[in-house]
UniProtKB/Swiss-Prot annotation:
Binding sites annotated in the UniProt record for substrate: R69, S70, G71, N82, T86, I87, D88
Catalytic reaction(s) noted: dUTP + H2O = dUMP + diphosphate + H(+)
Pfam families according to UniProt: dUTPase
Species of origin: Syntrophus aciditrophicus (strain SB)
The gene coding this protein: dut
Function: This enzyme is involved in nucleotide metabolism: it produces dUMP, the immediate precursor of thymidine nucleotides and it decreases the intracellular concentration of dUTP so that uracil cannot be incorporated into DNA.
Protein keywords: Hydrolase, Magnesium, Metal-binding, Nucleotide metabolism
Protein name: Deoxyuridine 5'-triphosphate nucleotidohydrolase
GO MF terms, alphabetically ordered: dUTP diphosphatase activity; magnesium ion binding
Length: 150
């Protein structure tokens, strides 16, 4: 599979860490590490913004999606507050990961911990076309559990 080349700036507090990387041959997301100076403890029900120590320059027409790691959610109840988070092509600041602890125990984020995944995806920009009505479908306006069995 062909890829795109993306410029990445490592910030001073990134030193000694790994760039985001794919952890298996066909992984869609690259794991992102925490660039914390000291351990960060996230108590149950609390949130923390975790620095990554990197900034990226995405090409026009692409976004980076910051997604939870399933293992953190399953084992610790830790996920992202805004999942997925979107990094726009014109953003040049440090990428931060906003974690929340839904678990019962404090969660410790150590330097170099893999805290999220980054997926690079194409973006489709739309032009709206207002209409007084929409084409009818079998589903219609059924949503929020409309396919649940009674």
């Amino acid at each position: 599979m062909t890829g795109i080349r993306i410029s990445v700036q490592t910030l001073p507090h990134f030193e000694g860490l790994s760039l985001p990387r794919y952890m298996s041959e066909h992984a869609a997301g690259m794991d992102i590490c925490a660039a914390v100076a000291d351990e960060v403890v996230i108590l149950p029900g609390e949130r923390a913004l975790i620095p990554t120590g990197i900034a990226i320059a995405l090409p026009e027409g692409f976004e980076a999606q910051i997604r939870p790691r399933s293992g953190l959610a399953l084992k610790h109840g830790v996920t992202l507050v805004n999942a997925p988070g979107t990094i726009d092509a014109d953003y040049r600041g440090e990428i931060g990961v906003l974690l929340i602890n839904h678990g019962n125990d404090p969660f410790v984020v150590a330097r170099g911990s893999r805290v999220a995944q980054m997926v690079i995806a194409p973006v489709c920009r739309v032009a709206w076309s207002e209409s007084g009505s929409l084409e009818t479908t079998t589903r219609g306006d059924g949503g929020f559990g409309h396919t649940d069995e009674s």
